[in-house]
Curated annotation (Swiss-Prot):
Changing residue 10 to A: Strongly decreased activity. PANTHER family: STEROL 3-BETA-GLUCOSYLTRANSFERASE, STEROL 3-BETA-GLUCOSYLTRANSFERASE UGT80A2. DTDP binds at residues 10-12, 246, 293-296, 309-314. It comes from Amycolatopsis orientalis. This is Devancosaminyl-vancomycin vancosaminetransferase. Belongs to the glycosyltransferase 28 family. It is an enzyme of class 2 (transferase). Keywords: Antibiotic biosynthesis, Glycosyltransferase, Transferase.
Amino acid sequence: MRVLLSVCGTRGDVEIGVALADRLKALGVQTRMCAPPAAEERLAEVGVPHVPVGLPQHMMLQEGMPPPPPEEEQRLAAMTVEMQFDAVPGAAEGCAAVVAVGDLAAATGVRSVAEKLGLPFFYSVPSPVYLASPHLPPAYDEPTTPGVTDIRVLWEERAARFADRYGPTLNRRRAEIGLPPVEDVFGYGHGERPCWPADPVLAPLQPDVDAVQTGAWLLSDERPLPPELEAFLAAGSPPVHIGFGSSSGRGIADAAKVAVEAIRAQGRRVILSRGWTELVLPDDRDDCFAIDEVNFQALFRRVAAVIHHGSAGTEHVATRAGVPQLVIPRNTDQPYFAGRVAALGIGVAHDGPTPTFESLSAALTTVLAPETRARAEAVAGMVLTDGAAAAADLVLAAVGREKPAVPA
């Protein structure tokens, strides 16, 4: 048996797919993954066949680059859907089920292909701000009508904008393969009941949300840390880690620079993750060390605190490691996870994406306090570690209930 995983998103989304692929492999199920070109090396490491689908995002979104004009945004939006119809049919050949992770627009195309082939379809998204709910508004960088505060209305507007942007391309491509048009484009992409790969302590399922919360899909990372990093860790007290992952755009380099200054003022050493923005150290002093991608599960257990952007992936790894966190949210679901860190008492949520020396100094005082460390370690013991196993069981249970393929 083989299952197709289709991922459209950042490295964190790819890791969600990798965790599920690993669990399915343990159950004797083969997988292949449609994923962005940048995922090639990671998928080769874990032995998952890779079907490149998408654009090299980390090359498109560099620090200081202006956003594309509206017509280019619309072209890219159409491409997101088009690429699924072009690549997924071939990738799904011989597969018994399809799981989409990440971008909802891509998921509408992936589900259409699964529908055509009569395959069970699951959609997975790790954040509640992407699932319509009367309790949480849409992601905070979504455009809204001035003066509208009713959460239900905000979600209705979100669904209408989504349909306007992606519906024409979706329904044109569906017609080409003999499928009827979709009216509720936003709801269609979610599938019959989304899988929610988020930990119930860190991101509890809200009432009235029809989803299956499996717990986080996390692959145990057994890779050793690089020798140079091990030497830096051994040379002094636990440092503070700074990293913004696959975030990019204006202000990240400045935020990292201010963070280094604030950490040094506390008498602490620094580890700086370069990330997609390719951050650089401010100088050549021996109290700072720059790294590329490493085993963060191992590293986070050996640092004094973690300063990060609040993505779902980084948030789950840091929380599971029991390390205090200072979250500087920038967009999408990051303010939600920053708020959860503060609510759980395992760190501090910075007010906005533009830190100052003063704001970070105050936050670090709380983050580095012994009581914050104790609370972070206590919460780490509550985090579920078998989310991918629960998801794999759901997928395999659905394989025997697939619908017949739609005739050409």
